[in-house]
């Protein structure tokens, strides 16, 4: 996971694990493979007793644009609703990621360097602390596309606001 073509980069700097979402050409939108690579980075950090904190950030101009829609199949025809349903990837990938972020044995700091959209915003909110650059923005536009917030977004937003 250290080569520059990996979807998630992992490095240790002193007592800090730096985890970088590394698909800048797609605004670091998540694929299933990327979730698995992120979980492996979490395992590395937790398995290293020298690591006392984790920083999560994105490469390029965005933090994370949420789900990479190429993970879904929008080909017209029978079964379209099942193939285009984001539910399975939310349940199998995003939900475990946000739960895992909240259960790591160390503080997790999200360095939001650009747009954090949809489930990407939920991932940022699942961290213990989010630090937003002047270029950062948080977008929850689910209602505009007929969805409800996923990856714990509804609960995490209320929690972070202290309501």
Briefly describe each language-model feature range:
Residues 1-59, 75:
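Conserved CoA-thioester-binding segment of acyl-CoA-metabolizing enzymes
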Residues 19, 56, 68, 123-124:
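Hydrophobic/aromatic residues within transmembrane alpha-helices
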Residues 33, 37, 93, 100:
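Charged catalytic carboxylate motif
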Residues 58-99, 116, 146:
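Glycine- (often His-adjacent) and acidic-residue-rich active-site loop
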Residues 99-163:
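Crotonase-fold acyl-CoA enzyme core
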């Amino acid at each position: 996971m250290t080569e520059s073509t990996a979807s998630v980069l992992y490095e240790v700097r002193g007592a800090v694990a730096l985890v970088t979402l590394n698909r800048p050409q797609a605004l670091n939108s998540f694929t299933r493979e990327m979730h698995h690579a992120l979980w492996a980075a979490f395992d590395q950090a937790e398995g290293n007793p020298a690591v006392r904190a984790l920083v999560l950030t994105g490469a390029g101009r965005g933090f994370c644009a949420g789900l990479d829609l190429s993970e879904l199949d929008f080909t017209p025809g029978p079964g379209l609703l099942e193939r285009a349903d984001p539910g399975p990837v939310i349940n199998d990938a995003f939900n475990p990621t946000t739960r895992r972020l909240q259960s790591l044995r160390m503080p997790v700091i999200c360095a939001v360097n650009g747009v954090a959209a949809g489930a990407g915003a939920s991932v940022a909110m699942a961290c213990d602390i989010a630090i937003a650059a002047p270029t950062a923005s948080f977008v929850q536009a689910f209602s505009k596309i007929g969805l409800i917030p996923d990856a714990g977004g509804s609960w995490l937003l209320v929690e972070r606001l202290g309501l």
